[in-house]
A protein has these predicted regions:
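Conserved blade-ending motifs and adjacent loop-strand segments that build the rim/top face
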Residues: 360-376, 408-440
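Non-cytosolic beta-sandwich-type ligand-binding/adhesion modules
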Residues: 14, 23, 50-52, 63, ...
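Blade-level signature of beta-propeller repeat domains, shared across WD40, Kelch, NHL, RCC1
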Residues: 430-482
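N-terminal beta-propeller domains
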Residues: 2-156, 163-168, 173, 177-206, ...
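Conserved loop/turn at the beginning of each blade in beta-propeller domains
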Residues: 105-106, 158-161, 219-222, 267-270, ...
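Short loop/turn motifs that cap or connect beta-strands within the blades
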Residues: 150-158, 207-214, 262-266, 309-311, ...
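Extracellular/virion structural assembly segments
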Residues: 580-673
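Exposed aromatic-hydrophobic patches
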Residues: 262-263, 308, 430-435, 538-547
Length: 673
């Protein structure tokens, strides 16, 4: 008696032996269009992460994007400097000395401008004896890294607070805006202007503004009620008259000495940012952001033009500047939104109109939880757009990021945002940044961290535009972390042995000096399991003595360190190679001959019925249950009839013509998964 097998809930008698074999798992059952890496299923594979200079925000490389070289240049999170070809530790922040005035308390710096070779900041504070509000102008001295000189811009005539709003240059004068009673009246909700030829002595305009905001000044408050824009020899004050829900513009043609109210009125709230850019006619105009949109003021026609409609949010436009993106076709306007995006608006001319793109860090996978928020301030350079971000809640840390413009190249691509600095105290924003080499020629990225409502700390990053490869002396943070994106190397279903990593790094020392500690996590786990240390003489580390660990995907974390006593040193690194081997699941196949003639006798079933059952199993779309030993393991297989045999074992080519003589049927069964 022969062997019996079960197929599709039917029992069949096998004539002779069952041939068992392995099925090639990389046959066309895997879709080539998905770009799975079938051509690299060798005994050992490796994947190279190049220098991560396409920026943060990529949590995981999609399986079908594994061969996209841009994906491997991204990182999920970073607190090292990834802007250059070789990654290094982030620049060490250094402290600036805040201004002091006897008998007075200075709260914070609101904004700044370069004037006659110096960087001038506008500060607000109070008189200690009676809490009367004060506004000050101070200039930055590079040799002492301190805010000094200057004079008092405005002083409250009673005991009420004042708020500094904005400072600008027109011709040979500084002009400042102040919120509060600063002219002998008790009008605490009025915006007033001041002007100065030297920053030390400040004067009241002969014809003053009269913009009533409806919001009283508060100590250290953040009211966005007035901004200044200079165009040629004219300066415009854009004032939020919140008590009547209107925005009005005042103009001075004589460097802030006298102001004239323009007749056009815009219904809206808040003036969060303002710059000089193009209106819809292609003319340079005051352009500003309100709670619900970006508007241009057509100075010739005395009308407002809507450039970009925004979802209403009080924090729209806090970051608002003009920058020449190296990847954009023209100079662009950048406007942050309250939900964390950055809108790039590019005017191309009256015939071409404008292009609007989202280039912010919220695209792709966004940002890790601790870095989420919205833009607070912006400052552009020839190569990067720097902006402060986040720090608006108890679990959020403010950071400074640098956008290199790459996100402009492909719509919905969030690449190009790089880490510069983090405020280590949560819920403390960075509310001012400025890039300047005044007054000593040394370029600094200045910024201010809020330490409380009425206290702050100004700091700077030295030489923020210079690559470490230049050889210029720089100071670096003591440590930093970067998380590479998680990847399954293009085969998400199959397990791999993750064997080791090799890091193309230099300027390494021992674990007391410059080195990287590598951690990993598999299958979505936090990358916190130790891989080993990359040190001088050891650039490759392995897992389980070279046997590797199993998982479908892996994520690498690099913990960078330098000598605690020497801030001039940093590891430098480029490509990270991950060695692995994908283990493709074995698939089984069976070939055998069903003895339909003897089955018909033993089961008293017509041969035609047995054959019909086999044809049904072949035709069924769902896989068929199969046991090569009755009661044994169940496999799910695809069924193929290979041919028919007569009673003499000869092949019958046409089944229908030879049905009475069919004695056996040849079958092939194969697993698919």
């Amino acid at each position: 008696m022969g062997t019996w097998v079960d197929l599709n809930s039917q029992r069949y008698l096998v004539r002779g032996d069952i041939q068992r074999y392995k099925v090639d798992p990389t046959a066309p059952v895997v879709r080539q269009s998905g770009r799975q890496r079938l051509d690299s299923l060798t005994s050992r594979q490796s994947f190279i992460f190049p220098a991560p200079n396409f920026g943060i925000g990529m949590r995981r490389i999609r399986s079908d994007k594994i061969d996209d070289p841009m994906m491997a240049r991204r990182s999920w999170d970073s607190e090292i400097d990834t802007r250059f070809e070789d990654a290094v530790l982030a620049i060490l922040n250094e402290d600036s000395t805040e201004p002091t005035t006897s008998g007075q308390t200075i709260y914070r710096l609101v904004d700044s401008v370069e004037f006659k070779g110096d960087l001038w900041g506008l500060f607000d504070g109070k008189q200690d004896s009676d809490n009367a509000g004060q506004v000050y102008a101070r200039k930055y001295t590079g040799s002492s890294t301190a805010w000094t000189g200057g004079g008092g811009v405005a002083s409250d005539q009673d005991t009420n607070p004042l708020q500094a709003l904005d400072i600008a240059v027109v011709g040979d004068a500084l002009v400042a805006l102040v919120l509060g009673s600063s002219d002998g009246s008790d009008e605490r909700d009025y915006v007033r202007a001041r002007y100065s030829a030297d920053g030390a002595s400040w004067s009241t305009p002969s014809t003053q503004m009269g913009g009533q905001t409806g919001t009283n000044a508060t100590a250290g408050g953040d009211t966005q009620d007035g901004k200044l824009v200079t165009i040629g020899g004219d300066i415009y004050g854009i004032i939020n008259e919140a008590d009547v829900g209107q925005i009005r513009i005042w103009k001075s043609t004589n460097e802030g000495v006298a102001w004239t109210q323009q007749s056009a009125v815009l219904t809206g709230e808040r003036v969060n940012g303002a710059v000089a850019y193009f209106d819809l006619n292609g003319d340079e105009a005051p352009v500003f952001c309100t709670r619900d949109g970006v508007y241009a003021y057509d100075t010739s026609a005395n009308v407002y033009q809507l450039l970009v409609r925004l979802i209403p949010d009080d924090n729209n436009g806090l970051g608002f500047t003009v920058w020449s993106n190296p990847f954009a076709p023209a100079q662009s306007l950048y406007c942050s939104t309250g939900d964390g995006d950055i809108i790039e608006y590019t005017w191309l001319g009256t015939s071409s109109g404008s292009i609007i793109r989202n280039v912010g860090p919220t695209k792709d996978d966004g940002l890790p939880t601790a870095k989420q928020g919205y833009v607070q301030h912006m400052a552009g350079s020839t190569r990067w757009l720097f902006y402060s971000y986040g720090g608006h809640a108890g679990s959020k840390n403010a950071t400074i990021l640098a956008f290199d413009g790459k996100g402009h190249k492909i719509e919905f691509d969030g690449s190009g945002n790089h880490f510069m600095h983090k405020n280590t105290t949560a819920n403390r924003r960075i509310d001012w940044i400025a890039l300047s080499n005044a007054d000593d020629g040394n370029l600094r990225l200045h910024f201010q961290e809020r330490t409380a409502t009425t206290t702050s700390d100004t700091k700077f990053l030295a030489e923020p535009l210079v690559s470490p490869a230049s050889g210029i002396a720089k100071k670096y943070m003591a440590s930093g972390v970067i998380d590479r994106p998680e990847t399954d190397f293009g085969l998400p279903r199959d397990d791999a042995a993750f064997i080791g990593v090799f890091y193309q790094a230099r300027d390494l020392g021992t674990t007391d000096e410059e080195y990287m500690n590598i951690d990993y996590g598999v299958n979505g786990a936090t990358p916190s399991t130790d891989f080993g240390n990359i040190i001088s003489g050891t650039q490759e580390v392995t897992l389980a003595s070279g046997a590797g660990v199993s998982g479908k995907s892996i994520q690498i974390r690099e913990n960078w360190n330098r000598s605690s006593g020497d801030s001039s040193k940093t590891p430098q690194a480029n490509s990270l190679e991950v060695m692995y081997r994908k283990k493709i699941a074995s698939l089984r196949g069976w070939r055998f001959t069903v003895d339909v003639a003897n089955m018909a006798v033993e089961q008293q079933t017509p041969i035609a019925t047995v054959i019909a059952n086999l044809e049904t199993a072949e035709a069924n779309v769902p896989l068929q249950a199969f046991e090569d030993l009755p009661g044994g393991t169940t496999y799910y297989v695809d069924v193929t009839i290979l041919g028919w045999l007569d009673e003499h074992g000869r092949s019958v080519s046409v089944y229908e013509d030879a049905e009475p003589n069919i004695s056996a049927v040849q079958l092939q069964l194969q697993e698919v998964l």
